[in-house]
Amino acid sequence: MAKVYIKTYGCQMNERDSEQVARMLVERGHLITPHENEADVVLLNTCSVRDLAEQKALGKMGMLGALSRQRPVVYGFLGCMAQSRGESLFKEIPHLDLVVGTQKFHRVAEYVENALARKAGPRMDDVRFSIVDVEEEPDSQGSIRDHLLSERQVTAFVSIMQGCNMHCTFCIVPFTRGHERSRPIDQIVDEVKRLVDRGIREVTLLGQIVNLYGRHEFPKMDGRSPFVQLLEAVHAVDGLDRIRFTSPHPIGFRKDLVEAFHSLPKLVEHVHFPLQSGSDRILRAMHRTYTAEKYIKLVDEIRTVTPEMAMTTDIIVGFPGETDEDFQSTKALVDRVGFDNAFVFKYSKRKDTPAASVLDQVPDRLKEERNQELLALVNDWARRRNAGFIGREVEVLCEGPSKTNPARLMGRTRGNKIVVFEGASRHIGQLLNIRITHASGYTLYGEPAPVNAGASPALAQGSLLRLSFRLGCGGQDGAPDREDRANGFDSSSGRPEIGNR
């Protein structure tokens, strides 16, 4: 039995992939440890959306090489950076043993055991004995389906597709994740049913561009897209209370999806709606396929059908050629929409993407100035939106203790607002009415009034360690309070939605 340390950089899809890897390792008798210093195996699941994420992973792996002075340790890079850099990573990290790409997560446990066996024999550091697998795998989209749930866990990610065909000019995701591939609806529904049987009450459906699910594999039915058909099928699962999805693309928001927020009560009032820029000129250069006017029209259509809709977004500042006029257009659109929150990132060159070769690159100093200016506007809107909840009662799914004070509980509203409140362990897994008493920029605080006095439904059993795979890779630079950071939002390293779509 080996002790395995897994650290994840990047989006929710990466977190879900890490969970799959952990589940397979546990099934083979290995132990997942949160303590890197006691690990026999170190796996870093990587992100390539921005250079900062890659540098963090490379730096971490370099530092952890010191463990091998104490005992044999297997080191592996997984995921997007592994896919994009491949065998070249061995030149940067000499002690590396494994490089496994985005379509081979289901092979990681096997490769780890091969490397462990090799380490137990005569010492061999030659790169020829290392394992590299970044090849395409048919039907790999169906390989991420098993879960490692903690005791009393009530939310889960469900991967419904892989890949992206949009080829935005700034984005490396189509190169690291491949073309769009979707799982069958019945397979996804079966996974959700198994999760509900184990105590899960909320699922988040994941895809690089999640609302384009199934467009190449499955037909429309009565004007409903395959994604809306999937939402309807998941909605019919007994015992499930909430459905979320991320990350969509504006091009996939058609009338049937907008109306689904009204017709499907389990579909929560929150949408992450990537903008990237408020300038039509920059949107064309990004190959985003919509205009600022079209984006605002979609926002208005969504809010007409669902007035309580919470909206978050992704924005890139300093894209090549961005002028002050372009940036002011972005600020104006942000002010027009009034987002509940936004992940704001400085443009990062990605190798082999069209934008990287543009000569008119924006200076780093100007990127930083625009980043801070836009963040001030975003944070102001976040505070205003949250202040509007003071004195109101909201429905909260209680997820567990606050990470800074186990005597307090935390959960999320249907609009994905973090709420911290006083309560008891029996509230975990329950839907509660919480009266909001005060708010910070990113967290609501309140007093509970349970919807039901009865016992909560059966919760996930067992003693498996709840895995903590999260590490943001973004560039949002606000200053949330200590409670905000601990309960899932640190704006100094704001995690992007999937692939920063």
Region locations from a protein language model:
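Short flexible coil/turn linkers enriched for glycine and charged/polar residues
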Residues: 150-154, 164-166, 267, 277, ...
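Short glycine/threonine-rich loop-to-helix capping motif typified by GTGT followed
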Residues: 217-221, 258, 321-329, 358
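Terminal RNA-binding accessory module
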Residues: 357-477, 483, 487-490, 498-501
